[in-house]
Amino acid sequence: MEKLQYELQGYLEIERYRKQRFLYPLLFREYIYALAHDHGLNSSIFYEPTENLGYDNDNKSSSLIVKRLITRLHQQNHLTISVNDSRFVGPNRSFYSQTIPEGFAGIMEIPFSMRLVSSLERLTKYQNFRSIHSIFSFLEDKLSHLYYVSDILIPHPIHLEILLQTLRTRIRDAPSLHLLRCFLHEHNNWNSLITLNKSISIFSKENQRLFLFLYNSHVYECESVLVFLRKQSSHLRSISSLAFLERTHFYGKIKHLVVTLRNDSQRTLPLWFFKEPLMHYVRYQGKSIMASRCTNLLMKKWKYYLVNFWQCHFHLWSQPGGIHINELSNHSFHFLGYLSGVRLTPWVIRSQMLEDSFMIDTAIKRFDTIVPIFPLIGSLVKAKFCNVSGYPISKSVWADSSDSDIIARFGWICTNLSHYHSGSSKKHSLCRIKNILRLSCARTLARKHKSTVRAICKRLGXKLLEEFFTEEHEIVSFIFRRTRLRSERIWYLDIIRINGLVPHS
């Protein structure tokens, strides 16, 4: 594999030296598919159904399949491709629609991946920035000093042609873009709009890598203006701002975007607009938060600027209510499964001056994170752990498993929820969710043995409960006193994805 990476990097260096960006020829290189497979592609897409190739044995090598694919690509004229082409209908169509998009997505990621690696070499704590909880530690440090917050939804739907035009600004390989256009034209209504939910059905499970590449490209372009604004403000060049850069997928075009957007933006807005010293931005998937210390009027200018920027540059119209501006002291916002906000904590300070003492009442701003109970119960209802009233019910589909397997499954869910929501400042909502899962586990066991919950709890005893306590709970108890453990927020830097039961949309 090192040889493949060396050969690939040598090819790209030659093309970079020639000041060309031709990625299309990589589709005809066998090592590209091996490299993409090694980096996490689903291996099943490299195997065409054996009845289509004339084989009776399902264990044939994938290298032969790739060679046949490359031969077909050489023979196929993509300028005249049609949805009615007999070579790509029936079983062959499935193979074409799976292998080509995944290979294309892997090739399109190559230039950005190499720039990403070179950028990460300068960061010694990159792993910490990958954690979702690092966002909250950043907000905890910054939001208590800010006044206003904007909840922003990245605009969609996206027209396919607009999306391709956006890609042309960063990918100058016309044959590759034409291949992508042919694929999208064949597998989707060209005049339709892609919404976040619709795109899941358009791009099948096998094509998720291509969809993620297109979606990340779209999101990056939508927030590219913020890269320019960050360059304009010297106050944003703090260590914490590295987290923003780490969560931007495509690094190599930052300088290019700054030059382009500077020329476009300075003609439409006065320069004083960018002099705001404290503007902070975080994003996860399609939801982003922008907070500032500026006035409500200036926040509205930010809102109108973003809406006009998306409309003029990308022909995207923000959804009604896509940007909400609220005062931090009076508003809490939903982000990554937490209900976050800034609340005033009253403090009484005793001041001693010689023989006189004074009691001073004051308030300190504190970043507050709460686990929203109703969205979590809604997730448990969808997963059939409880009803809409929060009353635990049995998980009937697990009733055929062994007792230890059932307990382990419920314990794993409870452990992950506790791990993710460890940053909550109030743990009573989390305790209620744990109780629902425990009783649901007991009811599932009672359903299996045709018994009662009381009899199951009496028979299993402590074994039924110990699975719902994590090892980290015991470790953290040595760090904090047990009286403070229920109120302390703990952020873990090993969480890189959200649990499926955590509502975050």
Swiss-Prot record:
InterPro entries: Domain_X, Maturase_MatK, Maturase_MatK_N
GO-annotated molecular function: RNA binding
Keywords recorded for this protein, A-Z: Chloroplast, mRNA processing, Plastid, RNA-binding, tRNA processing
Gene Ontology CC, one term: chloroplast
Protein localization: Plastid, Chloroplast
Pfam families the UniProt entry points to: Intron_maturas2, MatK_N
UniProt similarity note: Belongs to the intron maturase 2 family. MatK subfamily.
HAMAP family attached to this UniProt entry: MatK
Function as written in the Swiss-Prot or TrEMBL entry: Usually encoded in the trnK tRNA gene intron. Probably assists in splicing its own and other chloroplast group II introns.
Protein name listed in UniProt: Maturase K
Organism: Barclaya longifolia (Orchid lily)
Taxonomic lineage: Eukaryota, Viridiplantae, Streptophyta, Embryophyta, Tracheophyta
